[in-house]
């Protein structure tokens, strides 16, 4: 398979709206060629006996039982707040009222 050309890199750069210098075109052409070669080697692996998966290992959620535990009172939680109102943290308004 022929390598990636400067023109192909320039085309990709235009599509991505990137401005590349002439020396960068050569540099990225080599890098893209290496990446495509690596993907081609992975594609050559015998995969007929391997089922498609989204992860190499099975995923399991580790859950703990819900337990009621002591926590802060509203007064304790608000004690370090710079501003509070009606037992709530008061923060500056960031959204309009529209």
UniProtKB/Swiss-Prot annotation:
Any idea what job this protein has?
Answer: Allows the formation of correctly charged Asn-tRNA(Asn) or Gln-tRNA(Gln) through the transamidation of misacylated Asp-tRNA(Asn) or Glu-tRNA(Gln) in organisms which lack either or both of asparaginyl-tRNA or glutaminyl-tRNA synthetases. The reaction takes place in the presence of glutamine and ATP through an activated phospho-Asp-tRNA(Asn) or phospho-Glu-tRNA(Gln).
Family that this chain belongs to: Belongs to the GatC family.
Enzyme Commission code(s) on record: 6.3.5.-
- Which UniProt keywords are given for this protein, alphabetically ordered? ATP-binding, Ligase, Nucleotide-binding, Protein biosynthesis
Q: Where is this region: Disordered?
A: 70-98
For molecular function, the Gene Ontology terms on record are:
asparaginyl-tRNA synthase (glutamine-hydrolyzing) activity; ATP binding; glutaminyl-tRNA synthase (glutamine-hydrolyzing) activity
Gene Ontology BP term (one): translation
Species of the source: Streptomyces avermitilis (strain ATCC 31267 / DSM 46492 / JCM 5070 / NBRC 14893 / NCIMB 12804 / NRRL 8165 / MA-4680)
Catalysed reaction(s)? L-glutamyl-tRNA(Gln) + L-glutamine + ATP + H2O = L-glutaminyl-tRNA(Gln) + L-glutamate + ADP + phosphate + H(+); L-aspartyl-tRNA(Asn) + L-glutamine + ATP + H2O = L-asparaginyl-tRNA(Asn) + L-glutamate + ADP + phosphate + 2 H(+)
Supply the name of the protein.
Answer: Aspartyl/glutamyl-tRNA(Asn/Gln) amidotransferase subunit C
Q: How does it assemble?
A: Heterotrimer of A, B and C subunits.
**Stored Gene3D superfamilies:** Glu-tRNAGln amidotransferase C subunit, N-terminal domain (1.10.20.60)
């Amino acid at each position: 398979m022929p390598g990636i050309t400067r023109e192909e890199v320039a085309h990709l750069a235009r599509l991505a709206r990137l401005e590349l210098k002439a020396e960068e075109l050569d540099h990225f052409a080599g890098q893209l060629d290496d990446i495509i070669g690596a993907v081609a080697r992975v594609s050559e692996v015998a995969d007929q006996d391997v089922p498609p998966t989204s992860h190499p290992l099975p995923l399991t959620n580790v859950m703990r039982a819900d337990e009621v535990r002591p926590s802060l009172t509203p007064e304790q939680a608000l004690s370090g707040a710079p501003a509070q109102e009606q037992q709530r943290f008061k923060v500056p308004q960031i959204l309009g009222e529209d």
